[in-house]
Amino acid sequence: GLGDVYKRQHRTVHTALPTAILSGAILTVAGLTYSETFLIMMGTPDTVLPLSTVYMRIIFCGVTFNMVYNFCASILRAAGDTKSPLVFLLFAGILNVILNLVFVIQFQMNVAGVALATIISQAVSAVLVVIALMRRTDACKLYLNKLRFYKPQLAKILRIGLPAGIQSALFAISN
């Protein structure tokens, strides 16, 4: 009945966030470990390899924020709130530009500053989207103390999300 639907939605929301965090952590470790190898495989010129490696390693430190934003924004959109994720992304984009200027011009941080600005902006968008879920009044309301892996929901998230994620990654690599 309706109670079962609510329960499944509630469990999906509370499985999605830990899944995003765990996925992000795994990708961060892989990225930090293999950034230079990936860049060499892509044919990055030796002249820019050191700076590219710095940039990529810093960016990989923020992958978890990106995963949290994407998972939670998808939940909001599925629940009918398409505006909030867009507003949060717009705010994060403006913040990114401002932080780029501050870190690069004011603090002379160059490539590291650009990467740091990006992950700070991603962190802000992730926090905003989590707060939006915590303020909901429906089955998508997020309670931090109820986060866990519910096996049926995790299986469905992985069954649907893993192929889509691999497809997106392959598309990004090919371009």
Regions found by a protein language model. Name each.
Residues 2-6:
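Short, small-residue-biased leader/transition segments that mark boundaries at the very start
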Residues 8-22, 30, 34, 53-56, ...:
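Interfacial transmembrane-helix starts/ends
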Residues 93-127, 131:
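Membrane-interface helix-loop junctions in multi-pass transport and translocation proteins
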Residues 14, 82-83, 111-112:
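Residues that define the loop-to-transmembrane-helix transition and helix capping
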